[in-house]
Amino acid sequence: MNKFYNYNSSSHQVLLNLKVKPNSKQNLISDFVIINNIPYLKLSIKATPEQGKANEEIINYLAKEWKLSRKDIEIIKGHTNSLKTILIKNIDEDYLNLIINSYIK
């Protein structure tokens, strides 16, 4: 288990915590932040947090940025909160490490 995410090697799934900032100038993953001793990946999203628009844009952005299928990305916690838990299916751990390490400064 990495301190930034929980990877299940038998199912090729990962749980990842996001700290989302809606109404941003651009869609951007910046780095990590610790909130209540829990690490979160910081994600700025252009969409407003109304009627699921920001949640939809989160899924679209992550799928495009990380070259994943939209159907393999699901928000499982925090639908109406800026702190979210994302489930990503069908992802290789080596590829996931490459993605995550690219945001660590």
Swiss-Prot record:
InterPro entries in UniProt: DUF167, YggU-like_sf
Family: Belongs to the UPF0235 family.
GO cellular component term, pick one: cytoplasm
Top-level division of the source organism's lineage: Bacteria
HAMAP family: UPF0235
SUPFAM superfamilies noted in UniProt: YggU-like
Pfam families linked to this entry: DUF167
Matches recorded under NCBIfam families: DUF167 family protein, PRK01530.1
Name of the protein in its database record: UPF0235 protein RF_1332
Organism: Rickettsia felis (strain ATCC VR-1525 / URRWXCal2)
